[in-house]
Design a protein with these regions (language model features):
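Structured loop/turn residues at beta-strand edges in well-structured enzyme cores
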Residues: 3, 7, 34, 139, ...
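Boundary/entry segment of secreted carbohydrate-active catalytic domains
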Residues: 3-23
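Hydrophobic faces of well-ordered beta-strands that scaffold small-molecule active sites
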Residues: 8-12, 39-41, 75-78, 142-146, ...
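Short, solvent-exposed turn/loop segments enriched in Gly/Ser/Thr/Pro and often Arg
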Residues: 15-17, 42-45, 78-87, 142-151, ...
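Short, acidic/polar
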Residues: 19-33, 124-130, 253-263
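Aromatic-lined substrate-binding rim segments of carbohydrate-active enzymes
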Residues: 26-32, 41-102, 235-242
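Active-site region of glycoside hydrolase catalytic domains
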Residues: 85-249, 260-273
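Conserved small/polar residues in nucleotide/adenosyl-binding loops
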Residues: 280-282
Length: 282
């Protein structure tokens, strides 16, 4: 793994594909005026890169990479897996998350995937692999950026089944679960793993986000952090299988409590976080 950068990187997210190409050249001039030397690209381009299940199109991304490389910018290459393409949701609706109220979402927004969907995992890993293969020889790519701002929750059947697997691995026996969660309270004793359901508004958290059992709600959040981390590691390992010595990270969000960032940090080559500047900081 490379040990350091050749310079301190100064830049941010750059989405030239959202603008006419005649603007791109002007962008490069503005970057130089601002002493910007790096750009994070390809954060939300999955739909553009993979227009259908068995087709990749890197034409536009090639242009962006070449433009930045020719200007000697450091590139932080994202894997685009934070927002699903419409074709995937149409064919595989189970890739979408199910919300706190038990509603499976349709296509739209971002942070919209179920991390325990095997279909999502399959295509996210495949995309990360294809990106790494295509750009492995580009020396301007300094860091690989997996997904984007991991967060949110899903309460679908896939998550429920994997939660039970996670609990078995942690507690070994159903009696140990009952003891840890003090399920004698309100007559909640479990006798089989498949009696355990996800804690959402339809079950243990029916009163405005307050939980009947802190144990199950806390464990579900621990489980979900691990589920997201598994997705990160899946893509990270796919990139490193092609480019073993590259640096890989993802963007954490300050003191966000939804994920166990201490656990995540051990899996990251660089611990990085989002910095949203406002006018008072400029």
């Amino acid at each position: 793994m490379q040990s350091k950068f050749k310079r301190i990187l100064f830049g941010g997210d750059y989405n030239p594909n959202q603008w006419p190409k005649e603007v791109w050249k002007q962008d490069m001039a503005y970057f130089k005026d601002a002493h910007i030397n790096s750009a994070t690209i390809n954060v939300f381009s999955w739909a553009k890169i993979q227009p259908s299940e068995n087709e990749y199109n890197f034409t536009e991304l090639d242009e962006i990479v070449d433009m930045l490389s020719n200007e000697n910018y450091d590139i932080v290459m994202a894997t685009s897996t934070a927002a699903l393409p419409a074709w995937m949701v149409k064919k595989y609706p189970e890739t979408m998350s199910t919300d706190y109220e038990g509603r499976q979402h349709k296509f739209g927004a971002r942070h919209n995937f179920c991390p325990n969907s095997l279909v999502y995992q399959k295509y996210a890993k495949a995309l990360a692999t294809e990106l790494a293969k295509r750009y492995s020889g580009n020396k301007n790519i300094s860091v690989w950026h997996i997904n984007n701002e991991y967060g949110g929750y899903c309460y679908c059947d896939n998550c429920q089944n994997q939660f039970r697997v996670w609990l078995k691995d942690k507690y070994k026996t159903i009696d140990a679960v009952n003891d840890a969660w003090n399920t004698e309270f309100w007559g909640h004793t479990f006798y089989d793993w498949d009696e355990i359901v996800v804690p959402n508004e339809l079950s243990e958290e029916a009163w405005g986000g307050m939980t009947s059992f802190a144990g199950i709600s806390t464990d579900y959040r621990r489980f979900y952090s691990d589920s997201m981390l598994n997705c990160y590691k899946l893509e990270r390992d796919a990139v490193k299988a092609i480019i073993p010595d590259t640096l890989v990270t993802t963007n954490l969000m300050g003191t966000f409590k939804g994920l166990d960032y201490f656990k995540w940090a051990k899996e990251m080559d660089i611990v990085s976080w989002d910095n949203y500047l406002s006018l008072i900081h400029i």
